Amino acid sequence: MPLFFSPSKPGAVCSARWARALLLALVTLTAQWAWVGASHAQARDGAREGVDVGGNSAFGKLVSASEIEQASQQQYQALLRQAAARNALVPAQDPQVKRLRAIAQRIIPFAAPWNERTRQWKWEVNLIESPQRNAFCMPGGKIVFYTGILTSLKLTDDEVAMVMGHEMAHALREHARERMGKTAATGLGANLLGQLLGLGDIGQTVTNYGAQLLTLQFSRSDESEADLVGMELAARAGFDPRAGVTLWQKMAAASKGAPPQWLSTHPSGSSRIADIEANLPKVMPLYERARRKP
């Protein structure tokens, strides 16, 4: 006998009630996990300087960090091989590569407080010739910049540090791992709800669209968090966090015609600038202290 019935069939009411109870229990348990994690993080952050972004989501615990890091290493090496095959991998002696690696060496020492796993990471920084205005840091500390973001925006060292800190923050906060867990949980909830309501194909279409919007929201939240954590990392390394404002002003000017914020995977430039400015008082003392060090 199937676990769920269409509500039009005999026995459907009892089955639906049982399913609702199960779904409620799952949602409640997930909320409790998230609350406990946030509570521990709040206690931790109360004794530290810098930005407050709370604890990591419990969803990430559903996925193995080591497996993600191993997969990242494989994909990173494949990307570098592909770039080298088309003569797009910028050589190590290039001034821009040296510049990126020098900036990374200043930021990396401040990564471990955000994620203890970084003590075992083998950080790499590479530059690929491409007009893309993009950069990323994969789990395990694998960083790539594209020449387009450096040349088209004419980034200063402080602005490069803001970009790099932002991308490193995604890896430190394990956003990829968290998104995988959220995707699994969202799929489970959508399937249960569709079965509960007997919506058939229409229900599947609606729940798929809802899951997409949830994913977009998760991504915007991740981006906002990475902005703040990245700004703190850069400030602790002695880079001016006010460069986050000029960086996103440049990005906004170069990204005219972007989709509305609620349909974008990234926050709008204006909202990012507002968040950065609101948090500058938390990180400027860190920057001033780092700048005074010999």
What does each model-found stretch correspond to?
Residues 2-7, 13-21, 32-294:
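A Zn2+-metalloprotease active-site environment signal
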